[in-house]
Each structure stands twice: as structure tokens, then as C-alpha cells.
């Protein structure tokens, strides 16, 4: 039995997202997938590595439920899709956590069994029978093959045929240890029988192994067996165990072809539709290579119906963050543009007020223009009559005339102007003369307003 290491802290994942790293490195383009049952590991694959320090192998996760509860929970979840679900499915935290620990070699657990206690290897070497039934591996492979009733209803052999580093329902079965795994891989006799056991179970499901790379296809009796598989959901738990054991004993590359085949039959051919939830929630996530998982999930997404209920794709959080960033940038730009527009409007309003001021000044000039010669008569002038008859030749007059539509000049005599001028008009004329002395005052005021 495995035991938790004292003094070593491992942060238990608390969400599905913590357990699932499938889409964390999704920059490379994916090639077109081969046909159903095809696929193998290629160069450049990304084997998933633990996020924590290197874990100790072996042992049953202490934080997991008890063995019977563990299997019952898995069986209930994997068998919960006996009919086509109409509601949108949800990710299972139990499944995500269980498969996270498997892919990461069961973090922070170590072997406490003696290295010479190689129960699983000795069983596959035909040295000991599996308990409690007392049947040897050779008898299972020769006499149980094709006996689908026995394979269906006996629930103690599967833990011996496909051992794991975690406890199952059969307490007589022993968990694998790191040392035992290495010894098992070196033993050709054990490997040969292990592959025969795998073929036997594939045929029980209606599938056959077609080559040494792990490709699979429909068996001769596939219709009968697929119907049975579609109705017996406890076998989905067995498939999960088989996939895990393949990875432990050196056949990781066999997983993808089998999972791809099951997805094709469930989603495209619709021969085993009830298995699709377990295939997407469990089978896919037994694969340690992120790239292979992404290929399978992309294939499933193309054929999953209804498409809006597919929940195993890239996290929507990352997509929404990207859209939020775009939305954040556009309001900033629009606010900047609005501020610029407001600034321009302020300038325009100031310019318009300046123009109004100029127009008012011009109107005042028009009013007092006939009175200016009075001031000229007050000043000493050698030719008062000529000055009164001629238009004024100052810069202010020319500016005023350009800005206004040539005001009419009334020629009056100095005597008439003297009679019509009052003290108030004299003051206004004085102010107007001050503006004429500084012909640039209007422009300066305009500049001050703009600033």
C-alpha cells in the first residue's frame, strides 16, 4: 500500500482547471488526423511533466476515497450517461483529479512494499494464481477467452490483468511499484501475456488489434458486442483501467489509437453513443501527451452534437481575456478621441467667441466712425476740411473695412459734427482711437482666448 510522505507538501488541485493542462501549450499547428483507429506518437511530442518537484512512484493516493468508494464513484460517473444527455454536460472534478494524479505519477507517494514482493509480475509469469479465484494467467488466456459471460460478471480478475499503482475493488490485488514496473518491462514472458490479455479484452468489447503499433478496428462480432458495450456502463471503468495500465507497463502509444477509435464509433458512426461522455472525460485524459489529447479533443469537437455543449475545448477564460483586452483598448482610444474632439470644440467655441467679439468691435467702429473727425478737429490740423471729406487712411480703418462690407461714409462739415457730438461720444471716440493706435490688439486678444 502506498503511504503519504511526511514533511513533503503537495498542493492538492482544487479545480478542474488546476488538473487539466491540455491547452496550456497550444501554439503549434496540428496535422490532419488519420482515419479511425490510426495514430501513434511522433517526434516533438510534449510529455506532460509534473508541475511540482519529481514525485515518488507508487502507492494509492491517500487523499482519494477508499478503494470501494473510489471505484463506485468512478463507476457511477462513467455509467451515468446510459441515455443521450439533453442537458449540457459538466466537467467532473473527481475524474480530473484522479487522472491528474495518474499522469503525474501519483505525487508525493512512495512504495512501502518490499521489492521482492512482485505479485503482479509473478502472476504474469504464471507462478501464482490471482486471488481470490485461484486461477492462473494461462488458464485465463486460454479458457476465458471468448467466454463473454464470465468476463462480464466476474469482477476480480481485471485488477490482476491490468495492475495499477492504486488500489481497486479487489483487496487481494496488489498495487504496482516502481521497481516492479521496471522488472515487468524487462520480462518478455510477462509482456507477451500482457498483450494477449489486452487482445482478449478488446475482443470482448468488439474490437481487434491490427498491428504492433496499437492500431485497432472492428472485430467480426462488433455489432453484438457494441450493443452490449453501449448498455453496460461498468465496462467503461474497465476501459479506463486498461488504458492506465498500458501507460504504466510501457504501451503509452497504444492509448491514442484505441481512444480515437472509440470516439469515432461514438460520435461519427453512433454505434456506441452512450460511451462518449466517459471517452471525453476519462479515456482522453489517461494520455500523458498534451499534443495527443488536443488532437483527440479537436476530432471530437468536429463531430460532437450539439456543438455548443462541447466543454472539453480551450478554456473560455483565455478567449474572454483576449476579447476584454480588445474592448479595453477601444474605449481608451475612443476616450482619447473624444477628449481631442472636446478640445477642438473648446477651441472652436473660443474662436467663435473671439469672432463675435471682433464683430461687436466692428459694429462699435461703425457707430463711432462718423464721430472720429470731431477728435481730428480737436487736434491741430492744417487741412481740417480735407480730412473730413477723405476716408481715413489708418490701419484700423483698412482692417475694419476688410472685415465689414464697406460701410457708407457720410460727409459732414466740422460744424455739424461739433453740434451733434456729446461728452459721451467724445469718450467713445477716445476709446476707439486707442484701439486704432494698436491695430494688433484684436489679434492679441484672439490669441489670449485660444490659450
Swiss-Prot record:
GO terms for molecular function: opioid growth factor receptor activity. Residues 1-89, 308-451 are annotated as: Disordered. Residues 322-341 have a biased composition (Polar residues). Keywords: Receptor. Ubiquitous. Residues 43-66, 431-443 have a biased composition (Low complexity). Residues 362-381, 389-399 have a biased composition (Basic and acidic residues). GO terms for cellular component: membrane. Belongs to the opioid growth factor receptor family. PANTHER family: OPIOID GROWTH FACTOR RECEPTOR OGFR ZETA-TYPE OPIOID RECEPTOR, OPIOID GROWTH FACTOR RECEPTOR-LIKE PROTEIN 1. This is Opioid growth factor receptor-like protein 1. It comes from Homo sapiens. The lineage of its organism: Eukaryota, Metazoa, Chordata, Craniata, Vertebrata. The gene is OGFRL1.
Amino acid at each position: 500500500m502506498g503511504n503519504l510522505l511526511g514533511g513533503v507538501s503537495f498542493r492538492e488541485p482544487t479545480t478542474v482547471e488546476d488538473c487539466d493542462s491540455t491547452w496550456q501549450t497550444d501554439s503549434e499547428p496540428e496535422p490532419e488526423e488519420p482515419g479511425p483507429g490510426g495514430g501513434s506518437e511522433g517526434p516533438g511530442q510534449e510529455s506532460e511533466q509534473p508541475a511540482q518537484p519529481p514525485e515518488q512512484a507508487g502507492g494509492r493516493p491517500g487523499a482519494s476515497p477508499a478503494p470501494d468508494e473510489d471505484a463506485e464513484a468512478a463507476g457511477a460517473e462513467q455509467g451515468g450517461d446510459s441515455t443521450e444527455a439533453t442537458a449540457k454536460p459538466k466537467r467532473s472534478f473527481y475524474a480530473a483529479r484522479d487522472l491528474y494524479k495518474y499522469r503525474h505519477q501519483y505525487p508525493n507517494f512512495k512504495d512501502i512494499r518490499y521489492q521482492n514482493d512482485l505479485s503482479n509480475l509473478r502472476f504474469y509469469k504464471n507462478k501464482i494464481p490471482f486471488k481470490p479465484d485461484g486461477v492462473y494467467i494461462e488458464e485465463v488466456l486460454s479458457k476465458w477467452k471468448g467466454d463473454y459471460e464470465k468476463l462480464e460478471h466476474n469482477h476480480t480478475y481485471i485488477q490482476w490483468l491490468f495492475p495499477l499503482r492504486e488500489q481497486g475493488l479487489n483487496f487481494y490485488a496488489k498495487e504496482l511499484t516502481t521497481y516492479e514496473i521496471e522488472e515487468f518491462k524487462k520480462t518478455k514472458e510477462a509482456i507477451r501475456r500482457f498483450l494477449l490479455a489486452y487482445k482478449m479484452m478488446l475482443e470482448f468489447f468488439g474490437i481487434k488489434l491490427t498491428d504492433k503499433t496499437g492500431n485497432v478496428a472492428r472485430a467480426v462480432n462488433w455489432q453484438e458486442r457494441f450493443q452490449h458495450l453501449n448498455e453496460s456502463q461498468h465496462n467503461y471503468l474497465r476501459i479506463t483501467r486498461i488504458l492506465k495500465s498500458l501507460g504504466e507497463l510501457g504501451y503509452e502509444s497504444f492509448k491514442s489509437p484505441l481512444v480515437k477509435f472509440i470516439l469515432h464509433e461514438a460520435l461519427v458512426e453512433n454505434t456506441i453513443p452512450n460511451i462518449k461522455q466517459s471517452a471525453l472525460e476519462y479515456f482522453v485524459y489517461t494520455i500523458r501527451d498534451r499534443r495527443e489529447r488536443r488532437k483527440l479533443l479537436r476530432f471530437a469537437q468536429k463531430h460532437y452534437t450539439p456543438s455548443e455543449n462541447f466543454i472539453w475545448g480551450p478554456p473560455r477564460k483565455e478567449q474572454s481575456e483576449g476579447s476584454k483586452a480588445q474592448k479595453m483598448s477601444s474605449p481608451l482610444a475612443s476616450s482619447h478621441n473624444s477628449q481631442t474632439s472636446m478640445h477642438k470644440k473648446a477651441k472652436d467655441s473660443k474662436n467663435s467667441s473671439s469672432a463675435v467679439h471682433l464683430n461687436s468691435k466692428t459694429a462699435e467702429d461703425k457707430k463711432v466712425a462718423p464721430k472720429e473727425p470731431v477728435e481730428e478737429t480737436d487736434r491741430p490740423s492744417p487741412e481740417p476740411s480735407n480730412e473730413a471729406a477723405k476716408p481715413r487712411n489708418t490701419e484700423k480703418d483698412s482692417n475694419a473695412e476688410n472685415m465689414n462690407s464697406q460701410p457708407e461714409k457720410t460727409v459732414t462739415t466740422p460744424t455739424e459734427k461739433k453740434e451733434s457730438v456729446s461728452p459721451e461720444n467724445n469718450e467713445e471716440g477716445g476709446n476707439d482711437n486707442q484701439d486704432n493706435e494698436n491695430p494688433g490688439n484684436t489679434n492679441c486678444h484672439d490669441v489670449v482666448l485660444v490659450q
